[in-house]
């Protein structure tokens, strides 16, 4: 099954986040969440974002969907070390088939993964101008190991579910949390960085079963990587280790052509509520750090019940991808 970055799926599909520590599902459309549920996953079913035990994943999903009476059409999210994200600049190409061929040709050189063992997708995220003054397309290309994707799909289909799209958790995270265009055009508040908000990148750091980082300008995710820090540990070492990984990620992102300066860091996921974590990180990386509204301003309308909203950020972003 292919990746479906930015592709439309049937309205009503459920965003399904297989976090590792838990599974979360959200159904949303028109800015409103209609259903949401989550359940703990047994230890060892998913490890470092990859399916370790297909049979137990299938049984867990059967139980979860039956108990919560959820629709069977789902949009999956993935995040692990078997995924590579790269930026390409290409000549301005209008024909879709020609663009796809050009992306694949350049991806073979840019991505250290045999493309015959990978699923590949891309998104055009804007335009640039070359040194000679000619227009160029800015493209984000994603490659994922096919064997890894197939294990997710096998586990999901075994539970009687119908996967209708596969997205990156990082893209879903940005989709759920990115500020609206109107907010992005607002001037900076007193004491904030002087650059216009729309010219700054935002770092999103999701502290779930997998710690995931994304850098975005507006709603365009330009860089992503899973982090190794275990936020569930206590003490100052967590903030210190996480700050170092965030710093290194920002440095790597800033080395890319056309990178925008980072203006802030937004934390999400269950780990984002750890006491004083945002303040400690801000002091260590010298950037504003805040805990994001976990559902990005979506109308919940009582759909969460007693659920922890911080579990549902990625699933909500996946659901928004299905409903857009």
Task: Give the location of each predicted region.
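Hydrophobic/aromatic-enriched cytosolic interaction surfaces used to assemble or bind macromolecules
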Residues: 1-324
């Amino acid at each position: 099954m292919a990746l479906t970055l930015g592709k439309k799926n049937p309205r009503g599909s459920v965003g399904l986040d297989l976090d590792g520590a838990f599974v979360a599902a959200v159904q949303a459309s028109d800015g409103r969440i209609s259903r949401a549920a989550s359940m703990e996953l047994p230890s060892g079913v998913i490890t470092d974002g990859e399916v370790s035990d297909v049979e137990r994943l299938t049984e867990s999903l059967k139980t979860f969907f039956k108990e919560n009476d959820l629709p069977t059409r789902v949009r999956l999210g993935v995040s692990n070390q078997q995924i590579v994200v790269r930026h390409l600049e290409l000549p301005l190409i209008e024909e879709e088939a020609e663009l796809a061929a050009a992306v694949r040709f350049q991806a073979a050189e840019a991505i250290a993964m045999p493309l015959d063992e990978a699923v590949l997708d891309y998104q055009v995220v804007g335009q640039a101008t070359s040194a000679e003054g000619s227009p160029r397309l800015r493209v984000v290309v994603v490659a994922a190991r096919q064997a890894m994707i197939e294990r997710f799909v096998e586990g999901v289909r075994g539970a009687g579910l119908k996967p209708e799209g596969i997205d990156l958790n990082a893209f879903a995270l940005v989709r759920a949390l990115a500020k609206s265009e109107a907010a992005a055009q607002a001037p900076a508040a007193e004491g904030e960085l002087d650059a216009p908000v729309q010219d700054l990148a935002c770092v999103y750091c999701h502290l779930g079963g997998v710690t995931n980082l994304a850098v975005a300008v507006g709603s365009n995710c330009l860089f992503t990587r899973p982090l190794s820090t275990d936020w569930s540990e206590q003490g100052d070492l967590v903030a210190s280790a996480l700050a170092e990984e965030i710093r290194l990620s920002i440095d790597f992102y800033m080395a890319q052509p056309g990178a925008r300066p980072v203006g802030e860091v937004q934390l999400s996921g269950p780990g984002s509520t750890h006491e004083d974590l945002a303040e400690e990180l801000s002091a260590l990386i010298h950037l504003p750090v805040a805990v994001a509204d976990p559902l990005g301003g979506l109308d919940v309308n009582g759909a969460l019940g007693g659920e922890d909203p911080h579990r549902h950020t990625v699933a909500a972003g996946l659901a928004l991808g299905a409903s857009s």
